């Protein structure tokens, strides 16, 4: 079988690599020439444990080839971004563009699957688009939706071991899609209709957002009452039916920080809890900014000179290089606006460089700093000493 994967980003590339290593012939398509060139050279543009070796194997065996345009295949998969606009409305234009790019290549019996996160009803909408452009293919294609279920940092394991939800426009489509995924997914495959599969993805991430909001709200309460939030959570979690998450400086990533808006935009009257969770998590980022600014001001008043501040972490979660929707980026951007000549040192051990911020080795920035701000609990940070001669702002539980 030959499959064409449209989009070689944080989901498309790992999926293509895993499928290729299971013997499926994969043509990976991306409009970014640099990604295509890098992939064909066997070098991953994504930091992910184990991915580089598997990519090298896939390219060497010629099971994975990257191109800038799609080609004819037995199956087509859509892995493109679905961002939200400034009005917090989902933008499916990339999904539509990717779909239009494969419409001329479709043949009877082909499988078409969307993995991108989409509003409820999008798969049916794309099916209508395909059939408008190619009416002769009506009822001759297998069309399905299968949301990705993996987390950066553990992508390879979750790609193969997590259960998957597969929604078809009919039972035959769901079955055909499940047949394909069974070649590289060892988890159980659950078939349903497209709308249920679409909303399932949105519900999963909205639920996580609500959970995180609870933890973040607790951290603010504890700060105002002189209670250590990590101690509180550890004790509360001793209850067999309680599992409070670790608070952070907000919520990032292209899923949890974004997907709730897909439900909110479609069901504004029915999503009051989800909307409030979004407000809490957004506010937590601003709360952290206020705390950092206050610490800088307090230091200046006490010591009569400006502090050196180490900002530790830019990624949206520990031990990855993914900066999408990262609250740490927003925090650093605000702190960098301070016009008092405070020296700000930024460290992100998973990046070699950043297009805006000058990055400094985390050991050096920690050593020089008067104030250390932990925004991301990267594993290397946990080896740094919990000293008393510096102001430590641990927003993510590095020292928990």
Predicted regions and their residues:
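Structural/interface elements that position substrates and couple domains in central-metabolism enzymes
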Residues: 1-400
């Amino acid at each position: 079988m030959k499959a064409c994967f449209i989009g070689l980003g944080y989901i498309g590339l790992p999926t293509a690599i895993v499928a290729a290593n299971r013997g499926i012939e994969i043509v990976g398509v991306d409009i970014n020439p640099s990604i295509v060139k890098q992939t064909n050279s066997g070098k991953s543009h994504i930091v992910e444990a184990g991915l580089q070796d598997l990519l090298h194997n896939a390219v060497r065996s010629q099971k994975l080839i990257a191109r800038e345009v799609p080609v004819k295949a037995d199956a087509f998969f859509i892995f493109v971004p679905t961002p939200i606009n400034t009005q917090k409305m989902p933008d499916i234009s990339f999904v539509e563009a990717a779909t239009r790019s494969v419409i001329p290549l479709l043949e009877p019996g082909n499988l078409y699957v969307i993995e991108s996160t989409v509003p409820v009803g999008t798969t049916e909408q794309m099916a209508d688009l395909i059939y408008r452009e190619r009416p002769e293919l009506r009822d001759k294609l297998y069309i399905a939706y299968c949301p990705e279920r993996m987390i950066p940092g553990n992508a390879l394991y979750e790609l193969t071991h997590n259960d998957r939800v597969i929604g078809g426009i009919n039972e035959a489509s769901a079955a055909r899609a499940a047949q394909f995924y069974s070649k590289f997914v060892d988890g159980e495959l659950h078939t349903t209709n497209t709308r249920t599969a679409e909303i399932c993805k949105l519900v999963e991430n909205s639920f996580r957002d609500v959970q995180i909001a609870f933890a973040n709200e607790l951290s603010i309460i504890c700060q105002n009452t002189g209670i250590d939030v990590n101690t509180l959570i550890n004790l509360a979690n001793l209850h067999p039916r309680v599992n409070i998450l670790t608070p952070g400086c907000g919520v990032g990533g292209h899923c949890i920080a974004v997907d709730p808006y897909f439900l909110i935009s479609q069901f504004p009257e029915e999503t009051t809890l989800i909307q409030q969770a979004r407000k809490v998590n957004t506010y937590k980022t601003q709360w952290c900014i206020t705390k950092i600014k206050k610490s800088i001001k307090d230091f200046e008043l006490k010591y009569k000179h400006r502090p050196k501040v180490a900002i530790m972490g830019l990624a949206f979660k520990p031990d990855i290089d993914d900066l999408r929707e990262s609250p740490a980026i927003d925090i650093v951007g605000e702190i960098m606006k301070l016009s008092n000549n405070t020296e700000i040192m930024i460290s992100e051990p998973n990046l070699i460089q950043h297009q805006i911020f000058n990055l400094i080795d985390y050991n050096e920035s920690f050593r020089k700093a008067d104030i250390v701000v932990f925004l991301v609990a990267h594993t290397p940070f946990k080896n740094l000493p919990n000293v008393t001669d510096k102001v430590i702002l641990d927003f993510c539980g590095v020292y928990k």
